[in-house]
Amino acid sequence: RYKTTPEKYEKILASDSVFEHRTDIGWIRDTATLGRELSERLVRLRSADRTAGNRYVSQTYYETYDQWSPNPCFDGEKPYYDLSNPDYGYRLLTVFRFWNMVEYFFPSKYLTDKDWNDVLPEYIRRMAHPTGSYLRETRRMIAELDDNHAQYGGGIFELFGRYRVPLNTGFVEVRLIVVTPDTVPVKSERKAPFQVGDEIVAVEDKPVEYYMAQTREFISCSNENDVLAATADQILRTKENRPISIRYRRDGVTRDTLADVTKMPGHFGWNYLWKYHKTF
């Protein structure tokens, strides 16, 4: 048993100065769906006296901008490290875990392009009848947050490839431009002819716009410039260790060439992206 103090929490919730946004938990009173007994337990639990702290969620702190910021830590959730391709049940668990974490602990959920209430039914359908791998669907769901800090650290090689043309590029408006020579070494007898200012027009006979559309839904960024910067990094990736064809334009003349690729190290990813890739 636990002590409840409903008057304490109702008073807090009634103050407009405390909460700018409130989570709708009216569903706990839905006796038709939940049954009367479960509904009553949830209503009672809502007002439970939590003087000893929350048994499900704790706070962890990290240093940012010279101050310590709290983050929720979901101690009671099992990680399931060994599930590389989980079944239907675990896929749905992923959806509900992530959606609820955002629903109850993410203050910027009201700023996403898509209504967060629409995300849950959409990804229940996606995970129940997946059109892509578990990894692809998970990254797509995370990208719905439109937040640079919401990143799935693993799987970038599975989605976009471990090999990459060693060339730094960035978008100038909607054109992909060679920015600087790459600092990543590559062993090759074929020297790519690119110069700063060259426009990349197509990769493997597919226009740059094709890759922009393909990668956009997997990239979580808060503004268009960062989306384009992340896209610039993915366009020159491939899953095969072989030269790839690139069409580029210089001084109004379009040329075709083959460019060698290099294998990215295991840690290679977003840190490199934000350090070297710029969008103008």
Regions found by a protein language model. Give the residues of each.
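Flexible, low-complexity junctional segments that flank or bridge functional domains
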Residues: 1-280
